Amino acid sequence: MNPSTAQATAVVDELVRGGVREVVLCPGSRNAPLAFALQAADLEGRLRLHMRIDERTAGFLALGLAVAGKRPVPIVMTSGTAVANLGPAVLEANYARVPLVVLSANRPYEMLGTGANQTIEQLGLFGSQVRATISLGLAEDDAGQNSQWRSAVCRVLAAARGTRSGNAGPVHFDIPLREPLVPDVHAQGPVPQGRPGGAAWTTTQHATLDVAMDLDITPDTIVISGHGSALRPELAGLPTVAEPTAPLHGIPVHPMALPQLKPRQAVITGRPTLHRSVSKVLADPAVAVYALTTGPRWPDVSGNVLATGTRAVVTGAPDRAWINRCRTLSEHTDKAVRAQLAAHPKATGLHVAAAVMDALTDGDQLLLGASNPVRDAALVSYPAPKVRVLSNRGVAGIDGTVSAAVGAALAYEEGRTVALLGDLTFLHDASGLLIGSGEPRPRDLTIVVANDDGGGIFELLEQGDPQYAGVFERVFGTPHGMDLAALCAAYRVEHHLVGLGELSTLLSTPDAPGDRGIRVLEVTTERSGLRELHAAVRAQL
């Protein structure tokens, strides 16, 4: 067995021993030893391999697999620009604390700076965006290297999981490979062996970060449950503004009701990413702000946080009048939103979000696109307790969302997956629908596209003010006029153009036995009245 083949075989074997079950692979020559080893492991049923031709979308596929599967997922590619295409997925994984492993093949280091083709200084390419950058030395005809290879894999997985730091995230694992890059079918030689019984070479225990924080909940307290939050039993019963991806610790509070409440104290769990009303409360110097996190970082955009911890030691009790006020105002806001939706003459993204949220049932998985869909979902309803909600909120970009939805659906076997996206988000990553024949496909993924022919979110921001109407449509509205049915046909994906009523019916109708695969349900919406619709809701409060 030649050195590169031996090294790749040991690395893949140790990844499996370390708990890896899904791997995404992009074709290339320099990563051929890894490709052969991964294909063999896939045929043996030790892992599931996903082939993709575009490294950028492949990175987000791996991200979706990792988020939904709650395991590290390697994405394997050749050298050069192939590695650089992982940049957006690495950024998202960093800020969302997702265990993504970028396993890049590299040229031998003596080729750097020589003008060799497809050769760049890729070690360290991701800088501070990864938890660790780990490289292997060039493989030699030396059986003693087996322990070094396997030990390095265990370090990679430990860093990705955050087992010693409490801070999961992406890792760059760079492996220089020297020719021959293909196995010698006539002289295989001994396979590098791991620990007996399939054990990992190095076992690492999960570190527990336990920092108690004293919290008196007698003052009027609001809990802000942000992305990545853990459920906090000690905060049960407290009024909570929860993002769709975050747990609801206590009494639900509609984000649009928050300006009317005037809390004296706010407790952050996770990282708030959505609402301006939340940001204003957290920036108010008259509000005492505390932060509870599960890792070493804590959010504090305004610099107002008084204390941090990983758990609260609660004293006191909330005033019953405060609890009742929060509940009453929130219920009033919920009704105002639904009333204005019913009165609005045309379908908007809010209407589509309401139809989707109302159709979800226990066991469903929902993936929300960035920009308006995740905000719309937060305004129309809080997900049912047994609906799993995902969204790329690390950096909150629209890129890679179709691929992330495909990955999430592939990793989730317990029920169906529904993705709610805007048209620009869908178009930005339409190549995520490209799945090769014979490749694993989602069993049941419905992608709902609210198509308002452009960037609806800008209608609600400062740029959407009528005084900028002469500039708005071209540079912010960005109408595209694309035929989504034709686009889906090119990818051989089922597509239906539906109204709100038909959307509700299709989402609420039980599936027939068997695999549905992927389907796209497109709803034509309008964005020109969004600003007025939101203003009408606020006027009812």
Swiss-Prot record:
Catalyzes the thiamine diphosphate-dependent decarboxylation of 2-oxoglutarate and the subsequent addition of the resulting succinic semialdehyde-thiamine pyrophosphate anion to isochorismate to yield 2-succinyl-5-enolpyruvyl-6-hydroxy-3-cyclohexene-1-carboxylate (SEPHCHC). This is 2-succinyl-5-enolpyruvyl-6-hydroxy-3-cyclohexene-1-carboxylate synthase. Its EC number is 2.2.1.9. It comes from Rhodococcus opacus (strain B4). The keyword Protease does not apply. The gene is menD. GO terms for biological process: menaquinone biosynthetic process. It comes from the Bacteria. The keyword Ubl conjugation does not apply. Coiled coil: none annotated. It holds the Pfam family TPP_enzyme_N.
